[in-house]
Amino acid sequence: MILSRILEHKKAELRHKQSRGYLSELKARIQDTPGPLGFAVTLEATRTAGCPALIAEVKKASPSLGLLRPEFSERFDYLEIAKTYHTHGASALSVLTDKDFFQGSLDYLREIKQSVPMPALNKEFMVEEIQFYEARAYGADAVLLIVAALERQQMIDFYALAKGLGLDVLVETHHERELDRVLERLPDVRLIGINNRDLKTFTTDLGVTIRLASRIPAGKLIVSESGIHQRAHVVQLAEAGVHAMLVGESLIRADDIGEKIRELRGVSAQATA
């Protein structure tokens, strides 16, 4: 299973970072880093009845597809992509920082946050405490916790650590058992992600969000992830009570990113001019 491979590799990758010196360096950098923007608050403020808030993803590659665009082998202009998202009405950003499987970088996150005035999610496989300090030091406003990747107590501890650092937390689920675990163990969680991608087959099904959304109590922000490619999908999610959607692949691979955002949001070019 691809997730198991990624997690095993991630733990090995992080071993050399487990030093007091590096942690001290990150804590010092945090002191000089502006406080996080409100990721959840922004999603709540920018969603509408007919359109969930858009979390637009800066993504170079994936394990299943490789590079999302051929020209990325020569140049990946992550700053220009993030600025385009901002210009055309995205509510927030998601920035892939995993190096070996998604060809991301923490430096992408840092530079984007220095140039684009939007809240950003550090899209990473969080398996060690040091990663939360990295996320905060590099400018993240929110982090991702993947329930399938964590033990129960680890999920609780990581959530508390992130909140203690001032970060919002998107807790990602894939099925009913994971959702029930989150609602039981993290009763004050605000952001619940539902990933429509099957981690074994990598196929997507929006029915996963529709099924799980009905089980989530009021007061939570529901974020649908993966498999969102057209306006009809967005309408379907809005009708299911989804508050935000995380979209990467269909934006990155579009001939015109701005036009694709307008299509998904159901707005005219004049409305974003």
Feature roles, as predicted:
Residues 1-109, 114-120, 127-130, 161-190, ...:
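Conserved N-terminal beta1-alpha1 strand-loop-helix module at the mouth
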Residues 134-154, 193-201, 242-261:
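Glycine-rich phosphate-binding active-site loops on the catalytic face of alpha/beta enzymes
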Residues 150-159, 178:
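A short, conserved beta-to-alpha structural element at the edge of catalytic cores
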Residues 226-228, 238, 247:
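C-terminal active-site rim and adjoining tail of enzyme catalytic domains
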Residues 233:
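Acidic, divalent-metal-coordinating active-site segment for phosphoryl/phosphodiester hydrolysis
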